[in-house]
C-alpha cells in the first residue's frame, strides 16, 4: 500500500465556513457524540462512522470509543451499522447516503472492501478505514489490529496451552468468518502460520466458514466432531461469539474435553466465559481504542495533518490469569 498524504487544509477551511453558514446539514441517526467544549455547535466537524454492524458486543465498544472521541475533540460523530455482518446491501446504502449528506469525513468498517473502494472513488474528503482495510487511494489510514500478526500470536499461545493440556498430536482447525472477507482471511493466515511455526499441524482444507455468527459456528463444530471423533487439539475461531458457541457445542464430548478454543476480540462475554472455564483464551483487540483513534485520525486529516498508512490499535492475549482485569477495564469503558 503506497504512502497516503493528507492535503485537506483548504477543504477543512471550506467545511468550517459552510458549517458557520448553516450549509452543512446531514441525516443524523441520533447516535451522535456531542461536545459542549468550544465554539458553536454549527462550527463542528461532522463525521460519519459506518461500522460492520451494531448487533455484536465488539462493535458496541468501537462505537463507545468513537462517541467518546467526539466528546473529547468537540466534533459531531454519527455512528451507524447494518443489522448483521452479511447485510452487504444495507451497508452499501448507508455509505452511499452518507457520502451525499454533507459530512466532513468518513470512517468505514467495510463488509466488502472492493465495493467500498468503488463507492468512495474520487472522494475528496478524508476517508478512514476501521477494523478492515480498503485498498483505495482515498483511504488515508487504516486504524485497526494487525490481524495476521495478532492471530499468529494467539495461535502460538494456543499450541502451548494444548501441550500443557496433554495433547501430543497438535492439530488445529479454523472456524472462519465470511469467506472472502479481508479480516477473516488475515486471521486465517495468522492462525495457520502461528500453529505451524509452533510445531502444530493446521488442517487448512477442513476450514469451516460460519459467517462470523454463533449459530453457524455450532453447526460447523458439530461437523468437525463428526469428522474427527478422536478430538482436535485446537479450534481457532474468527471471533469470540463463534468460539464460545463452538465450545458449548463440544461440551459433553469427552474427546474434546481438553480442546483449546481460541477466540478473537477479547470482549466482555469472552472474559466472562474464560473465567467460567467455557472458553480457553482470546486474542484481544482494543475495540474502544480503535474507535477512538479513528475519530482522532479523521480530525487530524481535516486539519491538514499527514497520516501513516497503518494506525495500530494494539492487541493482547486474554487467559484466565488476566481476564478479570480486562473485564474491569471493559466495564469502565461503558461506565459500568
Residue map of PLM features:
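Hydrophobic alpha-helical segments within soluble ligand-binding/sensing domains
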Residues: 47, 91, 143-170, 214-218, ...
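Hydrophobic alpha-helical
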Residues: 96-100, 104-127, 191, 206, ...
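Sec-dependent N-terminal signal peptides of Gram-positive bacterial secreted proteins and lipoproteins
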Residues: 3-24
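Hinge/cleft segment of the Venus flytrap/periplasmic-binding protein
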Residues: 43, 175-179, 183, 194-198, ...
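Short, solvent-exposed amphipathic alpha-helices that sit
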Residues: 58-75, 150-157, 182-202, 216, ...
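Extracytoplasmic "Venus flytrap"
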Residues: 46-65, 69, 73, 78-92, ...
Amino acid at each position: 500500500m503506497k504512502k497516503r498524504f493528507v492535503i485537506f487544509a483548504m477543504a477543512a477551511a471550506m467545511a468550517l465556513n459552510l458549517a458557520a453558514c448553516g450549509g452543512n446539514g446531514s441525516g443524523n441517526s441520533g447516535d451522535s457524540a456531542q461536545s459542549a467544549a468550544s465554539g458553536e455547535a454549527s462550527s463542528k466537524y461532522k463525521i460519519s462512522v459506518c461500522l460492520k454492524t451494531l448487533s455484536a458486543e465488539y462493535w458496541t465498544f468501537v462505537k463507545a470509543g468513537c462517541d467518546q472521541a467526539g466528546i473529547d475533540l468537540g466534533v459531531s460523530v454519527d455512528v451507524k451499522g447494518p443489522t448483521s455482518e452479511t447485510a452487504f446491501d444495507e451497508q452499501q446504502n448507508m455509505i452511499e447516503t452518507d457520502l451525499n449528506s454533507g459530512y466532513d469525513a468518513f470512517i468505514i468498517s467495510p463488509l466488502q472492501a472492493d465495493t467500498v473502494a468503488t463507492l468512495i472513488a474520487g472522494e475528496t474528503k478524508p476517508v478512514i478505514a476501521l477494523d478492515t482495510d480498503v485498498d483505495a487511494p482515498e483511504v488515508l489510514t487504516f486504524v485497526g489490529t494487525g490481524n495476521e500478526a495478532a492471530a499468529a500470536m494467539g495461535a502460538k499461545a494456543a499450541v502451548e496451552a494444548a501441550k500443557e493440556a496433554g495433547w501430543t498430536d497438535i492439530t488445529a482447525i479454523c472456524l472462519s468468518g465470511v469467506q472472502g472477507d479481508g479480516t477473516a482471511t488475515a486471521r486465517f493466515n495468522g492462525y495457520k502460520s502461528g500453529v505451524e511455526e509452533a510445531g502444530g499441524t493446521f488442517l487448512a482444507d477442513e476450514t469451516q466458514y460460519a459467517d462470523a455468527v454463533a449459530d453457524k459456528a455450532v453447526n460447523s463444530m458439530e461437523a468437525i466432531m463428526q469428522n474427527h471423533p478422536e478430538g482436535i487439539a485446537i479450534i481457532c475461531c474468527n471471533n469470540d461469539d463463534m468460539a464460545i458457541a463452538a465450545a458449548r457445542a463440544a461440551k459433553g464430548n469427552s474427546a474434546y474435553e481438553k480442546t483449546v478454543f481460541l477466540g478473537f476480540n477479547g470482549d466482555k462475554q469472552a472474559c466472562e466465559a474464560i473465567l467460567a472455564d467455557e472458553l480457553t483464551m482470546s486474542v484481544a483487540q482494543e475495540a474502544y481504542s480503535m474507535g477512538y483513534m479513528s475519530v482522532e485520525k479523521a480530525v487530524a486529516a481535516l486539519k491538514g495533518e499527514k497520516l501513516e498508512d497503518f494506525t495500530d490499535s494494539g492487541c493482547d492475549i486474554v487467559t484466565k490469569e488476566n481476564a478479570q482485569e480486562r473485564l474491569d477495564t471493559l466495564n469502565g469503558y461503558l461506565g459500568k
